[in-house]
């Protein structure tokens, strides 16, 4: 009888422990499922924001014609957006530091959507300027806090990959969103492009509301001393400089990629469009690969390798630019490395800010975004 009772007690203990073990695994599985969904919400938002950032380039001639303004004036819409990013990234990020991250993220997507709706209904040039400034402000703060939100959703060893997933929305916008938006603008009018982007903003808003965890707290407001330290700490200044020079060099090459492939390599304008699409696909692949590389080997070793490869590829392109197939191969390989540095740069500045200025991490992230 006692033996049977002992067996029953042992069985009960086994069942309880097994149940706890199973429950732990179940919670882990649910968490692992939830995190990618939350990152997916950030990616959708990044895609919407990336589309409105880049699509204006293809709409400048149409806007200039319909609003009866000069091409340089229409081109100012690009500069005004960049000004909004530069202001929004460090300044508004610092001012909104105490707000819960989800609440701030949803508010940003409301501002972004409202800005694009204003652009859709803009009666004139000045209203369009205001609309672009508002969306630029939302852009700056989003990518500042988006990086820290993304890293908070995953273990530290996957931080760079999480940032890469978020920035993947930006690269996909470059590949698909911009050509699609330009197509809409050319066939239905530039206003309808902003309406379409507004719809993306609504989708991003709903996704953020449903999928982003509500328990991500805001940070303590950065004091003046903390903000000054973010602007003066040698290691952080070095990271900002690396971001500005390294990414700036790549983006300069991208800016003149189309004329170089057309005038030097001899490709037709139609072929150049396909080449840019292929370059965008390479960029999207390289972004994810760069995040995994930084997670596996560390941000600094990954960045050293990527920047060294970009240096070699840019030098090689001087030799291959006048030969079609060699130029094409160089460009496609360059695309893999072109955005591969972004996850490493962003996760590195977050890591160093947590070490040197723990009360101003989002501000440091914002300054690094502004350096892009």
What are these regions (language model features)?
Residues 142-154, 340-355:
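Intracellular juxtamembrane helix-capping segments at the cytosolic ends
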Residues 89-123:
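Conserved MFS/SLC helix-loop-helix module at the cytosolic interface between two early adjacent transmembrane helices
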Residues 125-127, 156-157, 164-210, 256, ...:
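Helix-loop-helix hairpin linking two adjacent transmembrane segments in secondary transporters
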Residues 68, 100, 121-126, 266, ...:
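Helix-breaking motifs and short loop linkers at transmembrane-helix boundaries and internal kinks
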Residues 358-372:
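A late C-terminal transmembrane helix in Major Facilitator Superfamily
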Residues 133-168:
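Cytoplasmic helix-loop-helix junction between adjacent transmembrane helices
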